[in-house]
Amino acid sequence: MSGAGSQNTRECEMKTTEQKRELSPHQALLLEMLKDLDAACRKHAIRYQLFAGTALGAVRHRGFIPWDDDLDVILLRSEYDRFFEEAAPELDPERYYVQREGGSHWPMQFSKLRRNNTACMEKYHPKDPCIHQGVYIDIFPCDNLSDAPAMRQLQFAAAKVVIAKALYARGYETDSMAKKLFMQLCRPLPRGPLERLCMRKEDTASQMVHTFFAAGKKYEKNVFPRSWLEESMDMPFEDGTFPVSAHYDALLTRLYGDYHRLPAPEERKCKEHAAILDLEHSYVEHLEEQKNMTFEVHTRSIR
């Protein structure tokens, strides 16, 4: 099946905290993937958390936000590195592809767990024909933030440059002239030193951490006390139980404000990340279709 826009709209039925509903096929597959990721992390005592809209869904809906079609997890950089060294090898390579940041076919500064033999192809034309485009879970690193205010702002700015360079390399398409110009201006800048500045791997005692590589627009929505990522609690999510921040109220308030309040009915729409969604066939079978697609509306996501 292709043309995810109309399919996602049909599948995104409303649910409240008290009401039960049937998951869309896409959400059901994401939940299955999350369970496998969770089992691998628990086996190796790797600390991760549901993050962003997925954490909001856990708290407010005890599962997916009904009109959402993605799944996000986050780890402190040290745990993130351990995930790839210890947990990722536990995942069945016949079913999963681990798309790690810095890989030969993935220029972004976060990673994805992809499901083989599926397609979740977004609204752009990849420059790299070998990029895996299966259904995915986003895996975000959380990095050390300097204790010096001026250096923090420098880290934020450096992350914007790194992201712009990565988006250009990936083939990101936008109708924003400002974004196009910024990506072009960033192209000659060195990526390695900027990445190291953003990560500050040696600064493991910093009081604050950041998610600048998740590409949030506002500085204050991407910086958190380290304890928010170190301290977790299990919370029901659909028919499973998964870790969220023990400080979820403060975290979600920072991200969303009054997160308990549901959006107006007209705003409860699927994000429609995918231009082509196929849960039964590989993205490889849709490459020619993707090549010939034109996009009237570009995704605002970096994913």
Predicted segments with their positions:
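Short, Lys/Arg-enriched N-terminal segments with co-localized hydrophobic residues
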Residues: M1-E13
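Conserved catalytic core of two-metal-ion nucleotidyltransferases
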Residues: E18-R42, A87-D147, L167-E173, M183-L255, ...
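Active-site nucleotide-donor binding segment shared across nucleotidyl transfer reactions
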Residues: D38-L71, Y80-D81, S227, L255
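Beta-sheet entry/capping signal
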Residues: R47-Y48, D72, D234, T241
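Short hydrophobic/aromatic beta-strand micro-patches
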Residues: I74-L76
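A short secondary-structure junction signal
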Residues: A148-L154
